């Protein structure tokens, strides 16, 4: 899991240079503790700066950072505004299920 936490921190640090990361949630196999060697890291990223940004542009930003950093394990992120998260919690089975066990990522990390 420490490798995953390092990858998440690197990813969020780079993303934070481009948008304000209000919240980040880890879900999927890493949150459940059932990951295997080939598992990716599933994140929900919440930022008010995603407002008005077309979804494909959000994904391009996420993918650009992923490939720039060559992070392993691979991070599969879902970029949402705070309002989109509220809607998804009601309408998306995947997000609603994830909310039952997700782990909020402490970002930005507290000072040492």
Q: Language model features by range: what are they?
A:
Residues 1-23, 32-37, 47-112:
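Catalytic core of pol beta-like nucleotidyltransferases
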Residues 27-29:
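Glycine-rich beta-strand-to-loop/alpha-helix junction loops that act as flexible
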Residues 42-46:
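Short beta-strand->loop micro-motif that forms the acidic, two-metal-ion catalytic signature
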């Amino acid at each position: 899991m420490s490798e995953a936490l390092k990858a998440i921190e690197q990813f969020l640090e780079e993303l934070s240079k481009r948008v304000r990361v209000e919240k980040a949630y880890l879900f999927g196999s890493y949150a459940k503790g059932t990951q295997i060697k080939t598992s990716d890291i599933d994140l929900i990223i919440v930022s008010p700066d995603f407002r008005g940004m077309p979804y494909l542009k959000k994904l391009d930003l996420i993918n650009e950072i992923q490939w720039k950093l060559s992070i392993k394990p691979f991070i599969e992120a879902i970029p949402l505004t705070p309002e989109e998260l509220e809607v998804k919690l009601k309408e998306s089975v995947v997000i609603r299920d994830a909310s039952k066990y997700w782990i909020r990522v402490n970002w930005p990390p507290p000072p040492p």
